[in-house]
Amino acid sequence: MRKKKFLSKVSFGSLFLLCGTVLSACTGIQADLRNLIKEATGKDIDVYKAIKTTEGKKNMITSLKKSYKVNPKDTTKLLLDAWKQSAEKGELGIPDFDFDDVIYPASKDPFTMERKIEYFQMTYQSFKDLSIEAKLSYTFNWFGDYSSGDFTAKKGDKHYFDLFPKIKSNSDPGKQFTTEKFLTKEEKIKVNGKEITRNLEWIEFSASLSFSLKGKDDVSEKSVNKFLSTFANNTEGYSSDINLFIYLEYLIK
């Protein structure tokens, strides 16, 4: 299945304002990260350069592990601020909300998908009581005709639906956030019969995810039921590991 591209449209004025806001946020994250690493290790590093190499990323995660030991409050704030700022830019880093596992039409996929984050509200005192509520709005833009059973879509049609995710800390005592969640390791996997080594740089947060999904009108609800039925209601919640390091990468790179 080909991955859907998420599209967004902004005016030139909005883009200019956004760029200024993003630059300020990224600069703040870089400065905070640099200060925490210096506090924990005594080293003053260029995080912009370090985060572009495997060795640099490993050293950064190791340094943040030390930082979490000596200053858990500010290290927690840094990691969660990076997550929130990334989400505000449209980067969630949670594959489930990209619907990669959904089975789309087998031949050609006659639509694109747009996603907009309406709000992303985060509250916490520590990782133990982290709680996030958000609203994501999606649009199917049909650029071709499609028909299957009682569902039809015409070129130019638009279908709209909203996703309401809730993200909380995993209550399992064995999955609580600790210094053991700062991971740098090599993993051997097979690709096309050949063994390759993959580097993993993770700061792992074990979360409990739940969400509801609703079409904005009857036709859109049919689209949801057709393509997203397995996602329509998951209010009981399930475990998912989220890599917090990717948000630092996203903002700094």
Swiss-Prot record:
Annotated lipid attachment (N-palmitoyl cysteine): C26
Any one of the GO CC terms: plasma membrane
Source taxon at top rank: Bacteria
Record's keyword annotation contains Signal: yes
Membrane topology note: Lipid-anchor
Lipid tethering residues (S-diacylglycerol cysteine): C26
InterPro entries in alphabetical order: Lipoprotein_3 (IPR001595)
Location in the cell: Cell membrane
UniProtKB keywords: Cell membrane, Lipoprotein, Membrane, Palmitate, Signal
Residues in the signal sequence: 1-25
Chief location: membrane
Family from the record: Belongs to the MG439/MG440 family.
Protein name: Uncharacterized lipoprotein MPN_369
UniProt organism field: Mycoplasma pneumoniae (strain ATCC 29342 / M129 / Subtype 1)
